[in-house]
Curated annotation (Swiss-Prot):
InterPro entries: G3P_acylTferase_PlsY. Probably interacts with PlsX. One of its GO terms (biological process) is phospholipid biosynthetic process. It catalyses: an acyl phosphate + sn-glycerol 3-phosphate = a 1-acyl-sn-glycero-3-phosphate + phosphate. It comes from Pelagibacter ubique (strain HTCC1062). Its EC number is 2.3.1.275. It holds the Pfam family G3P_acyltransf. The lineage of its organism: Bacteria, Pseudomonadati, Pseudomonadota, Alphaproteobacteria, Candidatus Pelagibacterales. Keywords: Cell inner membrane, Cell membrane, Lipid biosynthesis, Lipid metabolism, Membrane, Phospholipid biosynthesis, Phospholipid metabolism, Transferase, Transmembrane, Transmembrane helix. This is Glycerol-3-phosphate acyltransferase.
Length: 191
C-alpha cells in the first residue's frame, strides 16, 4: 500500500504545471499558445521573460526533488517509484489533459536527489553540448543519454528507470529531433 501512496503523491506533485501557472499569473497568457506550445522552462524562456523561465526551471526541478528526497530518507525501497512517478506527472499531468512538459528539469531534480554525481553527469554533458551547439533540445537529449550510459559502463547499476526516462525524454523531443535532422531547430539563448 505504501508504494501506491508514494506513486500517487509523487505523480500529483510532479504534475503541477508551473510554466502554465506562472505564465497565466504574470503574463495573463497561456504558455501553450507561445513558442513550441510546451509548458516547460525552455518555452517559458521564449515568453521573453527570463525570470519566468528560470522560475519555471527551478520549480520544475523542485517538484521532483521534494518527493524523491522524502522517499529516499523515509521509504528508500520506493525511490525509483517516486522518481518515475514525479517524472510521469510532469510529462503527462492530469491537470492539462495529460499534455505536459518534456521532462528534462524534472529529470535533473531526480538525478540530484538520488545521487549528486548523476546530476553532475547530466549537467556537464548538457553544458558541453550546449556550448558547442547552442541547441537546448540536443543538449537535453545528450545529457539524458549520458546518465544511463555512465551507469551501465562504470557503475554496473540498475539503470532501467533512467533508460525509461531517457526514452520518454527522446519521445517528448521527437519534433525537435526532426527539426535538428532538417537543420530547422531554433537555437536557445539562456542569458
Amino acid at each position: 500500500m505504501e508504494y501506491l501512496i508514494v506513486a500517487l503523491s509523487s505523480y500529483l506533485l510532479g504534475s503541477i504545471p508551473f510554466g502554465f501557472i506562472l505564465t497565466k499569473i504574470f503574463l495573463k497568457k497561456d504558455i501553450r499558445d507561445i513558442g513550441s506550445g510546451n509548458i516547460g522552462a525552455t518555452n517559458a524562456l521564449r515568453t521573453g521573460n527570463k525570470t519566468l523561465g528560470y522560475a519555471t526551471l527551478l520549480l520544475d526541478i523542485t517538484k521532483a526533488v521534494l518527493p524523491v528526497l522524502y522517499v529516499k530518507f523515509n521509504y528508500p525501497d520506493y525511490i525509483f517509484i517516486a522518481s518515475l512517478s514525479a517524472f510521469l506527472g510532469h510529462v503527462f499531468p492530469i491537470w492539462l489533459k495529460f499534455k505536459g512538459g518534456k521532462g528534462v528539469a524534472t529529470y535533473v531534480g531526480i538525478l540530484f536527489s538520488i545521487n549528486i554525481f548523476l546530476g553532475l553527469v547530466f549537467i556537464i554533458s548538457w553544458a558541453v553540448t550546449f556550448l558547442i551547439s547552442k541547441y537546448s533540445s540536443l543538449s537535453s537529449l545528450v545529457g539524458s543519454l549520458m546518465v544511463p550510459m555512465y551507469l551501465i559502463v562504470f557503475e554496473n547499476y540498475n539503470s532501467i528507470f533512467f533508460i525509461i526516462m531517457f526514452v520518454l525524454i527522446f519521445y517528448t523531443h521527437r519534433e525537435n529531433v526532426k527539426r535538428l535532422k532538417n537543420k530547422e531547430e531554433t537555437k536557445t539563448k539562456i542569458y
